[in-house]
């Protein structure tokens, strides 16, 4: 069962290996690309791979402006900006 809710639950439960296996094998017919990118973003965020997470959230928003990735991306950006203020001041 490779539904959005199923994979989201795997990510929330920290079963990241199984979530990755499910995402790798899922097709766009089963799960739209925007949802796939959102889930990949969550997966990479759980692994603290912020660059990959951001990339996937950006793709999700580009494909679906109403994606929940928009809010997650904004939160991620705010956290990053808060912790790395020096990057904002060249």
How would you name each of these model-derived features?
Residues 31, 64-65:
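Short coil turns that delineate tetratricopeptide repeat
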Residues 70-90:
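Terminal, low-structured helical/coil segments at or just beyond the last alpha-helical repeat
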